Amino acid sequence: MELPIYYCKTWFRMKKFAIEPMDESLAHSRHLSGESYTALIGSDSAPSCFVEFSIDKGMVGVGFLDKKCREYLTYQFQVTDSDNLFLTMATHREFEGDGDEVIGGESYIFNEEGGLVIRREKFNPHEVEEARSSFEPSRNYEKLPKFGCYSNLTKADR
């Protein structure tokens, strides 16, 4: 079953609401012209995830939200050409209990040549671990989606 999609200028992460909601026709126009917009998946007030299109800046971001609308997982895609995206970073956050305070997380930073940096960070006390590795980059490519067809970008398990 396809989830409903709502559109806005951006999702305000700190206050957990949509800024400047827009109708589908305006969002479609912005998609075609490469202007920024955000697609909210599942709900306009408590989406399961959102997709931020900033093609004019060469990026697409995906934020996955838990039941408390906290962004626990983020994907950052870079536009590689007119049809393709490359996943350059995935960040997983851990929260303090039911609150919004981030207590730690892991970031995976990928490059198109197969290089990988894994960064684990805790905030109290502050600790950072970093490791380097390699990976098969072909799995990080995605087609730039057509308007309204975001399911390839919103796969939480990559």
Predicted regions and their residues:
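Exposed regions on extracellular, virion, or secretory-pathway luminal proteins
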Residues: 69-70, 81-84, 98-99
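Short, well-structured hydrophobic secondary-structure segments
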Residues: 35-67
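Long terminal segments
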Residues: 1-34, 89-158
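Short, surface-exposed coil-to-beta transition loops
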Residues: 36, 58-62, 73-74, 85-90, ...
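Beta-turn initiation residues at beta-strand->coil junctions
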Residues: 51-56, 63, 73-81, 106-109, ...
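A short glycine-rich beta-turn/N-cap micro-motif
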Residues: 44-49, 68-73, 101-104, 113-117
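Generic detector of short, locally flexible boundary/turn motifs and exposed helical patches
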Residues: 3, 14-18, 39-42, 82-84
